[in-house]
Amino acid sequence: MRTTLVIMAAGIGSRFGGGIKQLAPVGLNGEIIMDYSIHDAIEAGFNKIVFIIRKDIKDAFKEAIGDRIEKICNNLDVEIAYAYQELSELPEGVELPTGRTKPWGTGHAVLACKEVLHEPFAVINADDYYGKEAFVKLHDFLVCYTPEKANQFCMAGFILKNTLSENGAVTRGICETNEEGYLTAVHETSNIVKTPEGAAVDNDEQLTSINAESYASMNMWGLTPEFMQTLEDGFKEFFANMGDKDILKAEYLLPIYIDELLQAGKVSVKVLDTNDKWFGVTYKEDKDYVVKSFAKLIEDGVYQKNLFEDLK
C-alpha cells in the first residue's frame, strides 16, 4: 500500500532570527533536519513525499533540498509532490480579510494537499527531528488502513521532557490517554519551559509546574484520505464561527481540530509511544545543539556520513 509523508514547511520562521529556519544546515554535509525525516520515512516504508511550502520560498526551498531530494527519490521509486499554502486559498464564498497577513495554521496547511493526497498519510513539521522509531510505528499503523477504518487515526506520543528547548518556551499539545492507549484529549499549551524539576508553563514570569512525563504531540499524525474532506468541512465551520475580533489572528490548528472531532466521538486516535528524543531549531540558539546531536548520531552509527547511502 502507498503511504505518504506530508512535511509542513510553509512556516515563516519568525522565531529564527529572520531566516528560513527549515532550511538551516545541520548535518556533516549540509543536510537540513528534513533530510533526516525523509531518510527515516523512506527507511520505514513510506513511498511518497509531499512538501507544503509557500510560493515565495519555492526557489530557495528547491535549491536547499527539493531538487536534491527529487534526484535521490527518483532512484528509490519514491514520488515527490508539492502543495502550496497561500492566504488566499479559502472556502468558496469566503474573501480574504483586509489586513490579514498571518498564515491560517496547520489545518489549512494540510488542506493545501487535497489534490495530491489519496492515500493514508503521516504529517510532520519540517523543523522537528522525530527519531526513527516514530516513523516505523506510524507506517505500520497506516498500512493497515481500509475504507472501513476511515476515522481511525494515530499520533506519535513523545514524552514531554524529551521535547523541550534549552533556549526558550515552546508550544506542545499536552495529551490525555485512556487505559487502551487512545487519545482522549489534547490541550494546545504555549510557553512551556524546561525547569530543574522538569517542565512548567511560564505565564508572565509565574511558573506553573506540569507533568514532564506526560505525552506531548509534536504534530506527527497518521491520517486517512477521507480526513481531507472532514478537514475541509472543518475549515468552513472555522470561518462560520470566527468573530470579527479574531479575523486577523485566528488559526485553524490541526491538533485543536482533531481534539474537537475526538470530543464529538467522530474519530479515534491511537497514541504510538516513542522514547526518542526530539530536537529542533525553534530558536537560533538551538542550532549548535542540533548540529552536535546529529554528529553524535552519526558517530554512534545511527546514520551514515553520507546520509542516504544505506537506502540504495
Residue ranges and their predicted role:
Residues Q263, W278-G280, K284-K312:
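Hydrophobic helical membrane-anchoring modules
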Residues P91-P103, G168-G173, E285-Y289:
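Short, surface-exposed amphipathic charged segments that create phosphate/polyanion-binding patches used
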Residues R2-E70, Q85, E119:
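N-terminal glycine-rich phosphate-binding loop and ensuing alpha1 helix
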Residues K132-W221, P225:
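Conserved core of the sugar-phosphate nucleotidyltransferase
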Residues E119-Y129:
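Short beta-strand-to-loop acidic/aromatic patch adjacent to the donor-nucleotide binding site
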Residues E232-V267:
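A C-terminal functional module that forms or caps the active site or interfaces directly
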Residues E70-E119:
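Short phosphate-binding loop-to-helix
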Residues G13, Y129-G131:
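A short, conserved beta-strand element in the Rossmann-like catalytic core
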